[in-house]
Amino acid sequence: MVSSNSIEVVSELLPILKVYKDGTVERFLNSPYAPPSPLGNTTGVLSKDIAITPDISARLYLPKLSPSANQKLPILVYFHGGGFCIESPFSILCHRYLNLLVSQSKIIVVSVDYRLAPEYPLPVAYEDSWAALQWVASHNTTTKNTKEDPWLIRHGNFDRLYLGGDSSGANIAHNIAMQAGTDTLHGDTKIHGVFLSQPYFCGSKLIGNESLAEKRLLQDTWMLVYPNAKGGIDNPMINPFAYGSRNLSQIQCRRLFVCVASKDELRERGVYYYKAVKESGWKGQVELFKVEGEGHGFHFFDFDSEKAKELVNRLASFLC
């Protein structure tokens, strides 16, 4: 006999997921799993899965290299999107995207598998992401690391360390870059640049041409994934413009790339973020890239479109 606890829905975030009374989470929008390519794919990009801690894993990417074994490459620590509650580095959408980005930009990528809400509500994803970044930075020290990775040791250029992400992953990249402004990374490693692609920010007050209808799912998602957030939807982690937020001039990097799409409900916040950084007194270089006629995550779902290719080209240029 099926227990009533297993079929009673206690919360839902449609069309994304349902949570049942017994703690089971049913996800509807996860994309299929894609295996790594330890022997390389058609572009010569190698990939492998590693464990950083018992709770945190990652997929690493290495581009096709010249015969020189000492070739040093920029490093991108990447955080996937999915509203903090779906997707992973091992999904076909993420894997395909990063394979292309690595082949074009010739970088090492560490794609972080942070734990997901609602089983692990925020700030767990932020904590996992910071721990993963510290693990990467630990390769930039003379101290022996028992879990060091040979790709990072042999080929990583720690003077060209980047963070990046899409949607909620861009939110993580922003918050981790802010944390790096106050907390020291191993080896005093510095973040060279950050890219935020269609970043997931929100707030109680409308900005620009935002509408309440567009914001409803964004707000509901935040309250599901971070139910104990102080200030709710105006917590500084989701609303970097809210009262009490740290000044954006404290973001710890030299270069910043922000991408927005004209049909994305997050577009107004992305543009506002770009302007706020410029006006904050931050000393780095910030660039805004607008994609016309496209919606949220277009480059994942229409992978072969000219605009998706243009975005990847712009990111590759930023990361090189």
What are the functions of these language-model segments?
Residues 2-320:
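Alpha/beta-hydrolase superfamily serine-hydrolase fold, recognizing
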